Amino acid sequence: MKSTLRISLKAGERIFINGAVLRVDRKVALEFLNDVTFLLENHVLQPEGATTPLRQLYFIAQMILINPEGKDHSTAMFRKSITMLLTCFKNEEILAELKRIDALVSTGRAFDALKAIRGLYAIEDNILNNQELPPTMVEQIRREIAPWR
């Protein structure tokens, strides 16, 4: 880390840091002085929120960050999922981003991958609403890559 990183949290807010969950009881500012893997509570997707293929991929990528003990399993699930999604989606923008997201995770940049996946939600919603991806395929993807349900 080239410089320090300062994050402000509100009372009751949680942050996931290197696999640990911290909750603050008052407004605080945290200053990270070295490299750290963290995820703010408002970016954490709960299992029940993983209702679309890309949200499922996000959930798996987030598990790489917040569950270090299960990182190998989560990474294997991510690989399986990304391969499946690359064969299912036809949208060129999504396909290009999925390849970039795969490279990010492969180089240990799961946090950046989460941001990129969130950026695809609107396109995915449009595809699903217009049924450009058949509902049967969406259901198959859900079954294949939803092991935490």
Swiss-Prot record:
Q: Which InterPro entries match?
A: Flagellum_FlbT
* Keyword Repressor found: yes
For whether the record's keyword set contains RNA-binding, the answer is yes
- Which BP terms does GO give this entry? bacterial-type flagellum organization; mRNA catabolic process; negative regulation of bacterial-type flagellum assembly
Superkingdom of this entry's organism?
A: Bacteria
Q: Which UniProt keywords are given for this protein, alphabetically ordered?
A: Bacterial flagellum biogenesis, Repressor, RNA-binding
Gene Ontology molecular function, alphabetical:
mRNA 5'-UTR binding
- Report the function annotation for this chain: Has a post-transcriptional repressor function in flagellum biogenesis. Associates with the 5'-UTR of fljK mRNA and promotes its degradation.
Q: Which HAMAP family match?
A: FlbT
Family statement drawn from the similarity comment of this UniProt entry: Belongs to the FlbT family.
What's the protein name?
Probable flagellum biosynthesis repressor protein FlbT
Give the source species.
Answer: Rhizobium etli (strain ATCC 51251 / DSM 11541 / JCM 21823 / NBRC 15573 / CFN 42)
